[in-house]
């Protein structure tokens, strides 16, 4: 199987996001890389499911709460930008202050 660098990056995001999901389900607080992977994964999957950029930007502020991440993580994650594939092409999705 031959994967492009972008495809490899997406697989790494998925792997880290699955770990983050397991930790969230166990009540373990996420660190910075896990939080970034989880938010990125939800954007990528939402785009594949047909949600719009605006819908993802709005929903992105509800996916993680301060009590689900380690201390200091919300301040580190002021903005998340990820390119996602939508039915009408690739677009940049930006989440502003996603952990509230």
Swiss-Prot record:
GN (gene name): ureA
One GO term (biological process): urea catabolic process
Matches recorded under InterPro entries: Urease_gamma (IPR012010), Urease_gamma/gamma-beta_su (IPR002026), Urease_gamma_sf (IPR036463), Urease_subunit (IPR050069)
EC number of the protein: 3.5.1.5
One Pfam family of this chain: Urease_gamma
Disulphide connectivity of cysteines: none
Family: Belongs to the urease gamma subunit family.
HAMAP family: Urease_gamma (MF_00739)
Subcellular location: Cytoplasm
Subunit structure: Heterotrimer of UreA (gamma), UreB (beta) and UreC (alpha) subunits. Three heterotrimers associate to form the active enzyme.
GO cellular component, one term: cytoplasm
Pathway recorded for this protein: Nitrogen metabolism; urea degradation; CO(2) and NH(3) from urea (urease route): step 1/1
Keywords: Cytoplasm, Hydrolase
Reaction catalyzed: urea + 2 H2O + H(+) = hydrogencarbonate + 2 NH4(+)
GO MF annotation list: nickel cation binding; urease activity
Protein name: Urease subunit gamma
Superkingdom of origin: Bacteria
Organism listed in the record: Synechococcus sp. (strain CC9902)
């Amino acid at each position: 199987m031959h994967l492009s660098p972008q495809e490899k990056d997406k697989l790494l995001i998925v792997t880290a996001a699955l770990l983050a999901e397991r930790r969230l389900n166990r009540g373990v607080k996420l660190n910075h890389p896990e939080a970034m992977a989880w938010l990125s994964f939800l954007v990528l999957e939402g785009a594949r499911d047909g949600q719009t950029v605006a819908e993802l930007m709005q929903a992105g502020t509800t996916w993680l709460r301060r009590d689900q991440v380690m201390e200091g993580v919300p301040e580190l994650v002021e903005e998340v930008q990820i390119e996602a594939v939508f039915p009408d092409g690739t677009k940049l999705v930006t989440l502003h202050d996603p952990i509230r």
